[in-house]
């Protein structure tokens, strides 16, 4: 009996250790209203970005009558919808990328060390929660924070590491990273 309890305690400890601590960022909070027979009912909608700052990020929307409840719902949804993104040297993207959602378009570029996060509003929150330190991004089209975050996430989902590209093409990573002979001759 004691041995069984001991195992359970170890399992509980392990699950607590394995659960990474997530950072979250409130991107937008809107007061919304619903017109009913007796007048207007007010509520709140929250948009939250959650990440472990080591390559995982997610976003969520939550609606409730009170702000803290809306934020809690959005945070829970964001944790359920997390994606993993391959980062180069744990600080930037592997390649330039474009993401789209609705009328929103986002262009993201890998940057050299020391550049910092050059991005506006909601995109900056996504990059910070993801753990990216150097990136240049530009939002074109819709400036709606929901569309900007979805477009950013679309671009990040398309991001692939040299290992993933090599695996897809059936080649070695060294072949993918090697410069073609024509470029070497010009330089």
UniProtKB/Swiss-Prot annotation:
InterPro entries per the UniProt record, alphabetical: Ribosomal_Su5_D2-typ_SF, Ribosomal_uS5, Ribosomal_uS5_bac-type, Ribosomal_uS5_C, Ribosomal_uS5_N, Ribosomal_uS5_N_CS, Ribsml_uS5_D2-typ_fold_subgr
Sorted UniProt keywords: Ribonucleoprotein, Ribosomal protein, RNA-binding, rRNA-binding
Region Disordered: start-end pairs: 1-20
Domain S5 DRBM as annotated: residue spans: 22-85
Pfam families named in the record: Ribosomal_S5, Ribosomal_S5_C
One Gene Ontology term, aspect cellular component: small ribosomal subunit
GO molecular function: rRNA binding; structural constituent of ribosome
GO BP term, example: translation
Record remark: domains: The N-terminal domain interacts with the head of the 30S subunit; the C-terminal domain interacts with the body and contacts protein S4. The interaction surface between S4 and S5 is involved in control of translational fidelity.
Stored PANTHER family: MITOCHONDRIAL RIBOSOMAL PROTEIN S5
HAMAP family: Ribosomal_uS5_B (MF_01307_B)
Function: With S4 and S12 plays an important role in translational accuracy.
Family: Belongs to the universal ribosomal protein uS5 family.
Subunit structure: Part of the 30S ribosomal subunit. Contacts proteins S4 and S8.
Name of the protein in question: Small ribosomal subunit protein uS5
Organism of origin: Cereibacter sphaeroides (strain ATCC 17023 / DSM 158 / JCM 6121 / CCUG 31486 / LMG 2827 / NBRC 12203 / NCIMB 8253 / ATH 2.4.1.)
Gene: rpsE
